[in-house]
């Protein structure tokens, strides 16, 4: 409290002194205050406080001293700031801060204060507070450090807050400037402290200064000369410590004055030609363009300003000359560009020279006045001469020719040699024009004709090292001289390899490859010259020389003198005759012409002429011509015909200028056509291409000529093309398999140009299009079975190539008599052997090339004569035997025969197997017979409409075996029957003793004709010998039932039916019915065991398929047995048929049963089912059975059960002492393994039975059987009664067949059979009937019935007392795998 009071007083004192202003220095004020308050401190402070106890000053204490002075600060609003201050002293001084002389409150003194005093003495501002009205943090701050010795004050430090306003005092504005002009953007930043700096941004990027072009001064942006790239959005940026401010964006638009990308240029054009002035400009904004003509207007109706701003003027004339200007304007400027137009007018004749006739020694003058722009130059020239006559030219040495400045030609002292055409030519840059006039000398003759070459060089193909003679015989007046050129170059006379003879022939010795080329013979005289050319080529096929022609080896004779038949102003028609006396045949003609006005040489005006008349076209009007004709043959050209009489063409209009007819020909002669390699496009088609060099403006078309190359040199076929730009064509229809020689000439208005070098190309071969000629057949000398066929090749035009072979066919009336043979291409005959005498054959021959066989010839019929000692049929038969022997030796026949034999054997084996199987099944059926009581089952499902019996093989039969067997209807009552067995002895282990499928199918077959269930017979018999049993049609379910376990012998028919029943065909019984002995009931079956014992032996029932309930029951015994009167034989009772006929009727049992002795009627008791008895296999006694007693009720049950069948304690007293059977079950088609599974047999015909037959009179989906179980099979060893029958010779045929089948089956491998022990099943012999007691007949089921017959699961009644226990026991017992059944003899 005292300290707070002192501090308060100190602050009040300081504040009062500052207001009074007496003391200027705060440090002095504080010292005075300290000294004045020393006594007060001494009295008020505690005596132990050394800081204010002046009487206890230590020697090391010191007054405060400011070590670190606070600096001036410039901070931003809202930002933190720190004023440092550090002091030294002893004791450590306290730091205080004053603002503008007032004490600064910190958080230590006032929690509401926003300033902090740091331990180092610095004053910290977490956030500078600054507003327009309140500025609490801005001011002058002083740091004071004090201890008891005194106080020290720091320098005054100012704290200022930086400020920058938002509004620019002047924002930049938009600027529009042209390219190259300066631009200025002004900007005045907003107010702020400190004063903000200014920078610029262009399109969001900082703008940098460019030396000399872009500068920033005082906030202004200045560009000395703008560029197109300077256009954009500019922003002025003002910045200081308080931040940055951006102005509104200002756009700088840099426009572009019009500038020319393409300027119009000066042009010079011909009159009537179009002209185009180009003008392309650029600018921003796009400039507008317009055209104007200096000192005039644009030609109305003849100009057009197109979309690209170019100026087009059509059909210009001299008046259109001038300067044309393109003007481009936009908002920032204007530009102009000009081009001049000069129109040249070709020279034109003002005065036309006229033809004149003068006598020798006279003077003549030819006028030739012209005009044009620019003015043309005029000169004269005589045709055929190289001398040019110009105006003002000095006179010739003769002094007879001169040209005036106006273009007039003067000739003085005309001579005979001055005759001819004189040409006036006017030439300027705009073109040229010529006019000619004819000077005729009176009395002139035709002695001055140019030389004529009688025989010139021909085209030749040579081999290296040979010698060649190139002839050149000439004639003329005066006699011409002969010189030779090779490839356009003169041959030197000193060359030793080339030698020119006196008659002009050129001799070349030891020809080399360098000597090949184009040779020309030139005959020259004072009257003119003539040229003849030919080429030499090297032969490629050295060893093959072409066959010489068969014609005379000399050229054709000279034709007759041509005669003029028709004259026009442009054409002359000539006619001549050939010379048939000498030389080779004429293939064509060549026509040459000479005109004194056209030059001093003969020119070819037509070639390849086929007829003896021709019209020469393309001639000049009013011109004299002379003609001669040559014939062309295989050996070259003939000598020329006599020269025709001079003929003048008709005159044309005199006002029309005459043009030079031969000047164009001279220009065409300079046009070089180079033929390229032809391309084969397809059959008979070539593409020909060429290039042209020289004055192409004279070319108006081309002539393409081709022919078949060869020594004969066929005629040329010509194709004229009228387009000068076309330099390729397609030749079609060329003969295949030949060499085609091709050449090309340029065509002009004046005629044809020089020929190109010919090119040869091969055409692909084709099959001959024609048959061989002259096919003939002659009998051969090689016996009577051969002929000789001869022929000639097809026509040359139909061969289509080189014949490589001939195909000969000799066709008989059947294909087996056909013969064919091939012969070489050079052959003309062939012999065919092996013909059958007496047969008519057709013989054909066809030629073949590499492309295929051609058209065959017409058939030629031939028939060989038969020998006189044999008839025609025998001869043919002998031929057939030979051919049959050949066929039998063919591998294909042998293979086919083997395959057929194999298939036949397989079919035979299958038939035998099927037959044997049928015998087995029928024998089973024959051996079985049934007496079954007609009992209706209320719960039966899926049964036939003719029966209400349960499905066979499923449930135990509710009745005991009947006492005696049913005698066969055909048996005598007095016949002696052995007792103890009803089946044949020695049964096969694989055999079944009942026919499930047969009886079921028979029931299905006869079900339609039977009565209702209630009307059926009580007992039925099965007659194996009856006719009805011989036709069993199978009606099997399409899907077999599931696995029935080891009791598949009671399975539905489809599981046991063999191949014999697959198709539902008839089954033929081969055996005879067996007479069965009668047995007594007590001898055959023991009494049943008690129900308590049977309940312990129940087996699994769930495996039985087709049942709707999981349990079985035994139906009650009938109240009375339907017995018939006993037969006279004793012991056998005959059941009367409903219709009183002995024929068999539908039976509902599959195995033999005896008649049941009637018992007194008792109320029906609930039956006790014994399913385990169904699973007990039967035992077979080793010897003949003795009569059985009732004390053995469990006689069919195995003594040693498998793992799946547990024997209860009550079952052992009733087991039979006979040996146990083997493990394998006797069910056909399946084998019972010891683990309780069924394995399919090796041969399985089931898959074939799944297809439903067409006729299904009877079908059960879920009924495994309708009949009682089969009888027990006999033992392996024959019973005593069977031995007695065998000894008595009474064995039936069926027994004998079965005995044979058993022997055959023994050879079958064990894997395909059911391996059975001879003692596998127990055979229960029938004995005389005995009667059961009432309790035995009503309370229990029959033992044999339990073992061999099971009631339908769908017709079960009430359940016995021990059913659930027995079913669970059967499940547990059947699930013990791996335990095999073993049978050990007891």
Curated annotation (Swiss-Prot):
Its main location: membrane. Residues 64-160, 166-253, 258-342, 347-440, 450-531 form the Ig-like C2-type domain. Glycans are attached at residues 25, 34, 41, 53, 156, 410, 459, 503, 784, 813, 820. Residues 1099-1112 have a biased composition (Acidic residues). Residues 1067-1083, 1178-1191, 1202-1229, 1345-1361 have a biased composition (Low complexity). Residues 1333-1344 have a biased composition (Polar residues). The modification Phosphoserine is found at residue 1263. Belongs to the immunoglobulin superfamily. ROBO family. Monomer. Interacts (via Fibronectin type-III 1 domain) with NELL2 (via the EGF domains) with a 3:3 stoichiometry; this interaction promotes oligomerization of ROBO3 resulting in the repulsion of commissural axons in the midline. This is Roundabout homolog 3. It comes from Homo sapiens.
């Amino acid at each position: 409290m005292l300290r707070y009071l002192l501090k308060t007083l100190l602050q009040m004192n300081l504040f009062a002194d500052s207001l009074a202003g007496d003391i200027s220095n705060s440090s002095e004020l504080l010292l005075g205050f300290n000294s004045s308050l020393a006594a007060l401190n001494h009295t008020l402070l505690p005596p132990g406080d050394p800081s204010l106890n002046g009487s206890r000053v230590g020697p090391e204490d010191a007054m405060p001293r400011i070590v670190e002075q606070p600096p001036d600060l410039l901070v931003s609003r809202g930002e933190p700031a720190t004023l440092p201050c550090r002091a030294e002293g002893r004791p450590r001084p306290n730091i205080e801060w004053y603002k503008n002389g007032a004490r600064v409150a910190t958080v230590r003194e006032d929690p509401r204060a926003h300033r902090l005093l740091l331990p180092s003495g610095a004053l910290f501002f977490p956030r500078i507070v600054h507003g327009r009205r309140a500025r609490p943090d801005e001011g002058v701050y002083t740091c004071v450090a004090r201890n008891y010795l005194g106080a020290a004050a720091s320098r005054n430090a100012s704290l200022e807050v930086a400020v920058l306003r938002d509004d620019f005092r002047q924002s930049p504005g938009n600027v529009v400037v042209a390219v190259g002009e300066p631009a200025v953007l002004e900007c005045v930043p907003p107010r702020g402290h400190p004063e903000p700096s200014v920078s610029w941004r262009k399109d969001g990027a900082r703008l940098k200064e460019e030396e000399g072009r872009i500068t920033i001064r005082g906030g202004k942006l200045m560009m000395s000369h703008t560029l197109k790239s300077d256009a954009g959005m500019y922003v002025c940026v003002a910045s200081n410590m308080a931040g940055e401010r951006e102005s509104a964006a200002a756009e700088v638009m840099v426009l572009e004055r019009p500038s020319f990308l393409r300027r119009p240029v000066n042009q010079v054009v011909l009159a009537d030609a179009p002209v185009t002035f180009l003008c392309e400009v650029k600018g921003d904004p796009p400039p507008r363009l317009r055209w104007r003509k200096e000192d005039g207007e644009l030609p109305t109706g003849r100009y057009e300003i197109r979309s690209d701003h170019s100026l087009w003027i059509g059909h210009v004339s001299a008046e259109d000359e001038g300067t044309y200007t393109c003007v481009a304007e936009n908002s920032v400027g204007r530009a102009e560009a000009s081009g001049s137009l000069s129109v040249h007018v070709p020279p034109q004749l003002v005065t036309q020279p006229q033809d004149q006739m003068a006598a020798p020694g006279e003077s003549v003058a030819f006028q030739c006045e012209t005009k044009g722009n620019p003015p043309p130059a005029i000169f004269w020239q005589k045709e055929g001469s190289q001398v040019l006559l110009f105006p003002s030219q000095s006179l010739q040495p003769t002094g007879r020719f001169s040209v005036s400045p106006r273009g007039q030609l003067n000739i003085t002292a005309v001579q005979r040699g001055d005759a001819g055409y004189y040409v006036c030519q006017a030439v300027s840059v705009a073109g040229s024009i010529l006019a000619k006039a004819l000077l005729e000398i009176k009395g002139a003759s035709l002695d001055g004709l140019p030389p004529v070459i009688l025989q010139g060089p021909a085209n030749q193909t040579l081999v290296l090292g040979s010698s060649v003679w190139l002839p050149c015989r000439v004639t003329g007046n005066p006699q011409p001289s002969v010189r030779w050129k090779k490839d356009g170059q003169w041959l030197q006379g000193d060359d030793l390899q080339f030698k020119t003879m006196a008659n002009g022939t050129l001799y070349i010795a030891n020809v080399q490859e360098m000597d090949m080329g184009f040779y020309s013979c030139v005959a020259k005289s004072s009257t003119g010259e003539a040229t003849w050319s030919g080429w030499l080529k090297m032969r490629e096929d050295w060893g093959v020389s072409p066959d010489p022609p068969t014609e005379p080896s000399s050229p054709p004779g000279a034709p007759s003198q041509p005669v003029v038949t028709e004259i026009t102003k442009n054409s002359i028609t000539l006619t001549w005759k050939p010379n048939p006396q000498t030389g080779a045949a004429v293939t064509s003609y060549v026509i040459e012409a000479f005109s004194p006005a056209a030059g001093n040489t003969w020119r070819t005006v037509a070639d390849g002429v086929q007829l003896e008349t021709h019209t020469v076209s393309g001639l000049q009007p009013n011109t004299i011509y002379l003609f001669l004709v040559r014939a062309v043959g295989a050996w070259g050209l003939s000598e020329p015909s006599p020269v025709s009489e001079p003929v003048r063409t008709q005159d044309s209009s005199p006002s029309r200028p005459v043009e030079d007819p031969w000047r164009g020909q001279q220009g065409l002669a300079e046009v070089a056509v180079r033929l390229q390699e032809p391309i084969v496009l397809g059959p008979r088609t070539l593409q020909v291409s060429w290039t042209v060099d020289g004055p192409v403006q004279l070319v108006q078309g081309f002539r393409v000529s081709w022919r078949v190359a060869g020594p004969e040199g066929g005629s040329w076929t010509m194709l004229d093309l009228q387009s000068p730009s076309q330099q390729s064509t397609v030749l079609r229809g060329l003969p295949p398999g030949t060499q085609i020689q091709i050449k090309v000439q340029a065509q002009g208005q004046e005629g044809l140009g020089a020929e190109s070098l010919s090119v040869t190309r091969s055409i692909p071969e084709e099959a001959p299009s024609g048959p061989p000629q002259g096919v003939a057949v002659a009998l051969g000398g090689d016996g009577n079975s051969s002929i000789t066929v001869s022929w000639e090749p097809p026509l040359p035009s139909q061969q289509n190539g080189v014949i490589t072979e001939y195909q000969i066919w000799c066709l008989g009336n059947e294909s087996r008599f056909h013969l064919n043979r091939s012969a070489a291409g050079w052959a003309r005959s062939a012999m065919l052997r092996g013909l059958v005498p007496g047969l008519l054959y057709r013989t054909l021959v066809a030629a073949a090339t590499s492309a295929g066989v051609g058209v065959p010839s017409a058939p030629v019929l031939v028939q060989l004569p038969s020998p006189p000692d044999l008839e025609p049929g025998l001869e043919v038969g002998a031929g057939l035997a030979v051919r049959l022997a050949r066929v039998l030796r063919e591998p294909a026949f042998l293979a086919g025969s083997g395959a057929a034999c194999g298939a036949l054997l397989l079919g035979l084996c299958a038939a035998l197997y099927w037959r044997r199987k049928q015998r087995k099944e029928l024998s089973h059926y024959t051996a079985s017979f049934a007496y079954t009581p007609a009992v209706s089952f209320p719960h039966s499902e899926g049964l036939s409409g003719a029966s209400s019996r349960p499905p066979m093989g499923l449930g135990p039969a509710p009745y005991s075996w009947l006492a005696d067997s049913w005698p066969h209807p055909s048996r005598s009552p007095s016949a002696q029957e052995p007792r103890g067995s009803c089946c044949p002895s020695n049964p096969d282990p694989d055999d079944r003793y009942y026919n499930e499928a047969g009886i079921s199918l028979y029931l299905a077959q006869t079900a339609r004709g039977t009565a209702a269930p209630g009307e059926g017979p009580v007992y039925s018999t099965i007659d194996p010998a009856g006719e009805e049993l011989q036709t069993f049609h199978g009606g099997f379910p399409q899907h077999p039932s599931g696995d029935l376990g080891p009791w598949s012998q009671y399975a539905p028919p489809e599981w046991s039916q063999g191949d014999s029943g697959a198709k539902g065909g008839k089954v033929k019984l081969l055996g005879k019915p067996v007479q069965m002995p009668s047995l007594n009931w007590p001898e055959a079956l023991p009494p049943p065991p008690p129900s308590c014992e049977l309940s312990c032996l129940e087996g699994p029932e769930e495996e039985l398929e087709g049942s709707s309930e999981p349990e079985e029951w035994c139906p009650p015994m009938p109240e009375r047995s339907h017995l018939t009167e006993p037969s006279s034989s004793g012991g056998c009772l005959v059941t009367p048929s409903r219709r009183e006929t002995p024929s068999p009727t539908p039976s509902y049992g599959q195995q033999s049963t005896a008649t049941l002795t009637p018992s007194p009627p008792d109320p029906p008791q609930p039956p006790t089912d014994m399913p385990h008895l169904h699973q007990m296999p039967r035992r077979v006694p080793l010897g003949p059975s003795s009569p059985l007693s009732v004390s053995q009720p469990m006689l069919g049950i195995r003594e040693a059960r498998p793992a799946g069948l547990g024997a209860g304690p009550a079952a052992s007293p009733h087991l039979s002492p006979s040996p146990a059977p083997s493990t394998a079950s006797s069910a056909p088609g399946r084998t019972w393994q010891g683990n309780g599974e069924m394995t399919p047999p090796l041969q399985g015909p089931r898959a074939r039975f799944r297809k439903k037959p067409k006729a299904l009179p009877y079908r059960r989906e879920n009924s495994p059987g309708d009949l009682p179980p089969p009888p027990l099979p006999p033992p392996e060893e024959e019973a005593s009664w069977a031995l007695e029958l065998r000894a008595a010779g009474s064995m039936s045929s069926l027994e004998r067949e079965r005995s044979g089948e058993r022997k055959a089956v023994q050879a079958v491998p064990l894997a395909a059979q059911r391996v059975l022990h001879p003692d596998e099943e127990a055979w229960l012999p029938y004995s005389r009937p005995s009667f059961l007691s009432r309790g035995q007949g009503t309370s229990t089921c029959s033992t044999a019935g339990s073992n061999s017959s099971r009631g339908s699961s769908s017709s079960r009644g009430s359940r016995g007392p021990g059913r659930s226990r027995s079913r669970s026991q059967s499940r547990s017992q059947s699930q013990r795998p791996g335990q095999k059944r073993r049978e050990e003899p007891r």
